[in-house]
Amino acid sequence: MKILEKALLENDSAAEEESRNLRTKRCARKRAWCEKTENCCCPMKCIYAWYNGQSSCDHTISTIWTSCPK
């Protein structure tokens, strides 16, 4: 019985990790990084999410500078 439980747990954790990697990549709304526009903040939120393994970041560093109002 314990062998069966262990096998089921291993299968569940592998499926969970796979589904987490396949989920839609988007900007995380984890923190408000600046007091300007969402376009300015969104790349930083993506970078935060990418750093924490929650998402990939489709924006480049240059996007941060070009999308922020002066």
UniProtKB/Swiss-Prot annotation:
Chief localization class? secreted
Question: Per UniProt, what is one GO molecular function of this protein?
Answer: sodium channel inhibitor activity
Entry's Gene3D superfamilies? 4.10.40.10
Q: Which residues form the signal peptide?
A: 1-26
Listed InterPro entries: Delta-hexatoxin
Q: Name one GO cellular component term.
A: extracellular region
| SUPFAM superfamilies cross-referenced by the UniProt entry | omega toxin-like (SSF57059)
Q: Which UniProt keywords apply?
A: Disulfide bond, Ion channel impairing toxin, Knottin, Neurotoxin, Secreted, Signal, Toxin, Voltage-gated sodium channel impairing toxin
Which cysteine pairs are covalently linked by disulfides here?
C27-C41, C34-C46, C40-C57, C42-C68
| Tissue expression summary | Expressed by the venom gland.
Superkingdom of the source?
Eukaryota
Q: Where in the cell is it found?
A: Secreted
Q: What free text does the record give on domains?
A: The presence of a 'disulfide through disulfide knot' structurally defines this protein as a knottin.
For this chain, the family text in UniProt reads: Belongs to the neurotoxin 06 (delta-actx) family.
Q: What does this protein do?
A: Inhibits tetrodotoxin-sensitive sodium channels (Nav). Intracranial injection into mice causes strong convulsions and death. Intrathorax injection into crickets causes paralysis prolonged for 2 minutes, followed by recovery.
What is the designated name of this protein?
Delta-hexatoxin-Mg1b
What is the species of this protein?
A: Macrothele gigas (Japanese funnel web spider)
